[in-house]
Amino acid sequence: MAVEPLRVLVTGAAGQIGYALVPMIARGVMLGANQPVILHMLDIPPAAEALNGVKMELVDAAFPLLKGVVATTDVAEACKGVNVAVMVGGFPRKEGMERKDVMPKNVSIYKSQASALEQYAAPNCKVLVVANPANTNALILKEFAPSIPEKNITCLTRLDHNRALGQISERLNAQVSDVKNVIIWGNHSSSQYPDVNPCTVKTGSGEKAVRELVADDAWLNGEFITTVQQRGAAIIKARKLSSALSAASSACDHIRDWVLGTPEGTWVSMGVYSDGSYNVPAGIIYSFPVTCKDGEWKIVQGLPIDEVSRQKMDATGAELVEEKALAYSCLT
C-alpha cells in the first residue's frame, strides 16, 4: 500500500529558518524516511519572489519523498488540508525593541493565521509555533482556532532542550546521544529554567547523574543556565543573524518525537497548554518534560522539585502570565 502524503505547512518559508527547514522536511527528517510529504509554503507578498526561488530549488533537489509544493502568499490556500503546521513567520524583534513592542503585530498575525487554520486545516492538524514570543503566539493561535484540540497546539522549546544537552555533552566530553532527560521549564525566553537535576549520561558503567559527573554545582547552577538562556543572543552576535539551522533541526525533532514517539525512558521538552501540573499556572503555554506515544504527548509527572527549581519555575511562569495579559490587551 502506498503511504498517503502528509501536507506540511511552513509559514515564513522564504526566511532563514524556512530555508533551513524545508529541505529537512523534504528529506524525511521530520516525519520519517517512509512518509511522503506535500509542502505548503506561505510568506508575505514582498517575499513572493524569494519564495518562488525556494520552490524552484525544491524542484531542482528532486527529493523522492516530496510529492508536491504549494508556494503562496494567500493564507487560505496555504492552510488547506494541512496535517502539520510549523509557524515560523512572525514580526521579528529588532535591536532596541522590547518584547512588548512586537506583541501587537504578532497578535494580529497569529489571530489571522489561527482563523485560516480553523477554517481550512485537516481536522487533527498538529501545530508548532516557532516565531517569538513563541509561547504567547501559540496561546493566541489556540484562542482563535477553537476547533483545533488544545493538545495539538504547541510551541518550540526543543531548541533550548537541545542547547542544554549540547552544553552538558561538551562539558563532559560525552556523546550528545548519551545525554538525556534535561528539562526546559517555562517560557522560550531568557527566563526559561534549564533543569539538570534529573539529567543522566550513559557511561561505561551505566547511567550516571549529570550533577554527580560534572561535580561542579557552581557551573551547573550558574554559567550552564545562563549559557542556555542566552545562547540565541550569542549566535546573533557571532553570525549577525539569528539561529536558523539549529532552530530548523529542533523543529523537526519536536514534530518527529510527537508523531513517532519518544524512546522508552526518555522525555523531551515541549511548550504545551498547562493543566496546572507542578503548580504551574493553568491557561498558559509552558514548557514541560513530556513523553510522546501514538501522536499524543503526556506531561511527565511526579518529578521532585527543590526550592531553587521552584523559584525559577515560578519566575518564568509569572513572565508568561504577564505576556498573556499584554497579548490580550492588544485584542481589545
Curated annotation (Swiss-Prot):
Gene3D superfamilies (alphabetical): Lactate dehydrogenase/glycoside hydrolase, family 4, C-terminal, NAD(P)-binding Rossmann-like Domain
Keyword NAD recorded: yes
Alphabetized UniProt keyword annotations: Cytoplasm, NAD, Oxidoreductase, Tricarboxylic acid cycle
Top-rank EC class of the record's enzyme: oxidoreductase
GO biological process: malate metabolic process; tricarboxylic acid cycle
Subunit structure, interactors included: Homodimer.
Protein name per its UniProtKB record: Malate dehydrogenase, cytoplasmic
GO terms assigned for molecular function: L-malate dehydrogenase (NAD+) activity
Reaction(s) the record says it catalyses: (S)-malate + NAD(+) = oxaloacetate + NADH + H(+)
Domain of life according to the entry: Eukaryota
This enzyme's EC code(s): 1.1.1.37
Keyword set includes NAD: yes
PROSITE patterns in alphabetical order: MDH (PS00068)
UniProt xrefs under InterPro entries: L-lactate/malate_DH (IPR001557), Lactate/malate_DH_C (IPR022383), Lactate/malate_DH_N (IPR001236), Lactate_DH/Glyco_Ohase_4_C (IPR015955), Malate_DH_AS (IPR001252), Malate_DH_NAD-dep_euk (IPR011274), Malate_DH_type2 (IPR010945), NAD(P)-bd_dom_sf (IPR036291)
Family: Belongs to the LDH/MDH superfamily. MDH type 2 family.
Residues bound to NAD(+): Q16, I17, D43, G90, Q113, N132
Location of this chain's protein in the cell: Cytoplasm
Sequence positions that bind oxaloacetate: R99, N132, R163, H188, S243
A single Gene Ontology CC term: cytoplasm
Pfam families documented for this protein: Ldh_1_C (PF02866), Ldh_1_N (PF00056)
Record-annotated active site: H188
